[in-house]
């Protein structure tokens, strides 16, 4: 009888790994008769499961236990183990030059990677996201966003601004297949992003919005997204403060980013953008901290004049010299990194 009860308890907790359980619930779920020896005998079984590291007491002496998720060792050098190549993610291009953002040649993207894009409000996050979508359209990417759709009569439809941008980009991007069906999937998602990730696909999220008192949750949100990617990758846009050195969420964002890019204003023209390579876990050249400038044209659809820039050697990035606007950098604080 005791062994039979033990088997029942083990089978039950096996089904609820990662959750919590208490003695009373176990008795109820297993329909144990209060007058039977099993009523108290279940405590012996629980004690045994604690010793076997199947259950863990809460520590509050309240009879609550966490069911520990069981794992098996992973053999690394298994005969015939496949070596997966880098993920062939195409970065946005300079429309006029036809070349991908030059730093992308020095970044290695792997399956399951997460690219975060921290951008100041109205500084081109959507432009970068849509260009990622366009460059990888033949891989049938997934696009989620809180400004791409609008609710009309109980049904989500593409927002006017979004479809206008796609119409402009259709001059150089084939958004549909031969049968007229979308070559990408648009999901009207504004929360619970991880639950809607499409495994083994490029998932582009523009953008994740969290309340100010929830920014510490961003690490968990990004971790959950990564866990669902399979052999796909994610590109996630996040808001960034004007003078901050990272996306909102700070270190929590950096902890889970395989590549971290930042977007700021470059000049008094709101369509001039400064891109900083803040982080990259796998790279083939020293690119961290490098900065690039470009302009956005044609209603936020094209990236042009993409080039590397460095801090102005005359004003040291301060935009002014001797109380006057710096002529060398035209009051941007930056200068094109021209080859010698």
Question: Which role does the model predict for each range below?
Answer:
Residues 117-118, 122, 216-314, 318, ...:
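Phosphate-binding/switch region of NTP-binding enzymes
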Residues 50-60:
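A short, conserved structural fragment
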């Amino acid at each position: 009888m005791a062994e039979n009860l033990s088997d029942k308890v083990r089978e039950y907790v096996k089904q609820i790994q990662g959750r919590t359980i208490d003695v009373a619930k176990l008795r109820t779920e297993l329909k144990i008769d209060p007058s039977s020896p099993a009523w108290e005998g279940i405590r012996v079984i629980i004690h045994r499961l604690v010793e076997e590291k199947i259950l863990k007491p809460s520590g509050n002496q309240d009879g609550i236990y966490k069911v520990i998720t069981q794992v098996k060792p992973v053999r690394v050098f298994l005969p015939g183990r496949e070596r997966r190549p880098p993920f062939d993610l195409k970065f946005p291009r300079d429309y006029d030059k036809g070349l991908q953002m030059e730093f992308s040649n020095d970044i290695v993207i792997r399956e399951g990677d997460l690219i975060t894009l921290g951008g100041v409000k109205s500084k081109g996050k959507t432009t970068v996201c849509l260009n990622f979508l366009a460059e990888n359209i033949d891989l049938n990417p997934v696009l989620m966003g809180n400004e791409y759709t609008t609710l009309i009569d109980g049904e989500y439809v593409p927002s006017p601004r979004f479809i206008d941008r796609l119409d402009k980009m259709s001059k150089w991007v084939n958004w549909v297949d031969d049968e007229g069906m979308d070559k990408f999937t648009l999901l009207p998602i504004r929360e619970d992003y991880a639950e809607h990730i499409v495994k083994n696909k490029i998932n582009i999220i523009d953008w994740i919005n969290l309340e100010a008192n929830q920014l510490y949750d961003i690490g968990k949100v990004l971790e959950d997204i990564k866990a669902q990617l399979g052999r796909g990758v994610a590109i996630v846009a996040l808001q960034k403060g004007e003078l901050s050195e990272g996306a909102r969420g700070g270190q929590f964002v950096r902890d889970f980013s395989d590549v971290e890019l930042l977007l700021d204003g470059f000049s008094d023209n709101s369509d001039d953008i400064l891109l900083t390579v803040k982080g990259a876990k796998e790279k083939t050249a020293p690119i961290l901290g490098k900065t690039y400038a470009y302009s956005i044209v044609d209603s936020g659809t094209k990236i042009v004049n993409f080039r590397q820039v460095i801090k102005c050697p005359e004003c040291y990035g301060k935009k002014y010299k001797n109380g006057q606007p710096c002529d060398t950098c035209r009051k941007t604080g930056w200068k094109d990194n021209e080859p010698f």
